[in-house]
C-alpha cells in the first residue's frame, strides 16, 4: 500500500513554468530509470535525472515510458548543446549544470553565459516550449551570482536551482520576481527552502525521510 496517496491534497498542488505539480517536493536520483516508478510511489512531485556518461541514446529512449506519468527534470552537464538537443523532447524541465561540464566547482561566468545563450537559441528550433533552469554552484561569489541572475532574466532562462542556504539570499536579490528551485539534502533544509519562497525543492532524501517531508508539507500550518 502506498503511504502517500493520502497526502495528495489540493493544498500541495503548485504550478511552475506552465507545469502542474501535485506537490513542490522532488527527488534527485541516479540515472537509473528503474527507480522512477519507485519515486512516483513515494509521491515525488517531480524527479531530477542526469543522463549516464555512456549509452545516452538508449537511456533517453527509456524515458518515453514515463512521459506524462512523472514530471521529469533532466540535469544536463556533459556535451551540453548535444545532450540538450537529445533530451529536449523527453523532458518537462531541463536543468543546465555547467559545473560538471567543466569539472570544476565554479566555472567562469562568461563561459556559463555563453552556454546559456546557446541553449536558449537551440530552444527556438522546437515547436513546443520546455523551461530551462540554471544550476548555480556553491563556489560562486555573491557578485558572480548576481551577474548570473541578471543574465538569466534577460536571456529567457526560466529559473535557477540553488543550494538551500542560498535560497533566501537569491530571492531577496530578485525581489521574489524570479523562480528559484532549492536543492536540499535534509528535511529541515527542504522545508526552509519552501518557507523562504522557493517555487520547488529538489531533494536527495531516501524514501522514509521523503515520506516525512510530505507529511510536514501536508500539515495546515506549513
Where are the model-predicted features located?
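Glycine-rich phosphate-binding active-site loops on the catalytic face of alpha/beta enzymes
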Residues: 49-52, 93-102, 159-165, 189-216
